[in-house]
Design a protein with these regions (language model features):
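Charged phosphate-binding loop/patch that engages nucleotide di/tri-phosphates or the phosphate backbone
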Residues: 124-140
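Active-site nucleophile-adjacent alpha helix/oxyanion-hole segment immediately C-terminal to the catalytic cysteine
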Residues: 1-42, 48, 53, 57-60, ...
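Extracellular and analogous surface-interaction loops
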Residues: 21, 68-72, 136
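Conserved active-site-adjacent core of cysteine acyl-enzyme catalytic domains
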Residues: 33-93, 98-126
Length: 140
């Protein structure tokens, strides 16, 4: 899976969905905007519903939020909430994608300022919870 760099300061949710959907940021941004989802809307990084709505547009199923127990307990494909904190009593976080494939695990982090968007520095990331995601197969 390939990383997608967020083109807006607060577009990590959109970029994470773009990576999962195999599309680029601008296309995911257009889809999000058509659904009434915008990167500067605080709900995008303080609620899961906007990301869930965008995932549904791309036929990607999302499970419930599950507190992180360990990296090894994560499903093979998941959204993670890192940099979780509270501001004024409201939770905020940075969306990233966890991938386990071909005997390798990594995190796709869309933050533009990073030197690499494929991360394996698991000790530095502190996920609060994960959401299992999977592509819905078309019926044929």
């Amino acid at each position: 899976m390939k990383p997608v760099v967020q083109l807006e300061r607060t577009g990590c949710g959109i970029a994470s969905v773009a990576a999962l959907a195999g599309t680029n940021y601008r296309q995911a941004q257009r889809s999000a905007n058509q659904l009434g989802i915008f990167a500067d809307d605080r709900r995008l990084w303080s609620e899961t519903q906007p990301v869930r709505t965008l995932l549904k547009r791309y036929r990607i199923r999302a499970g419930t939020e599950i507190p992180l127990v360990s990296w090894s307990a994560l499903p093979d494909l998941a959204l993670l909430a890192i940099k979780w904190h509270r501001e004024g009593g409201r939770a905020f976080w940075h969306w990233v994608v966890f991938v386990r494939e071909h005997d390798r695990s990594y995190v796709l982090d869309s933050k533009r300022a990073l030197n690499t968007h494929v991360r394996t520095d698991f000790g530095r990331m502190r996920p609060k919870w994960s959401i299992r995601v999977e592509k819905i197969r078309s019926r044929r």
